[in-house]
């Protein structure tokens, strides 16, 4: 309820709901699952775990040592993941925003209209599924700042991966309709497939890119591309 607080430590809860003005704090040994945050605030502290939940119009804060998994950020939701925190198996829906200083691993979907901002020290460490495809898929926008890294990621549909000066990326697939914008940063092992576009602007360096039929790599003034293969 409005102004109410639930503190969970060393215990487990399920099927709860945090409404606007309400706060749930999950600390060491606490485990919350199968619940909704509807306009309220969820704080996952060191040693706490939140799983199988939805944030709708509210906020999620995962602090150092905290873990959040198997969740969805719906329209209007905002989430912050601090350095030392871990999140995985998540969907960021249209109109939601995730700010990342910690680490995201595997099974991530950034929907059209959603935004993921990766700041210094943050990392998207994707993986490959049993068929060899990346488990991190971007249809919205991912902005990667200096000191941040992303790997094993696919940019699909109308998605955009924007790599700013001082950021790094490797093992990226740019698929049909996807855009990879590279400025002042370095990449390796980039696959640009039919309908995909990579643009390298001043200070950017694309190393080891492969351009497949129908794909496009544009190197602008001040940018560079090394060891490029065009199929």
Name each model feature, range by range:
Residues 231:
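Active-site region of the double-stranded beta-helix
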Residues 2-4, 11-16, 20-24, 28-33, ...:
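The right-handed parallel beta-helix/beta-solenoid scaffold, focusing on the short coil/turn
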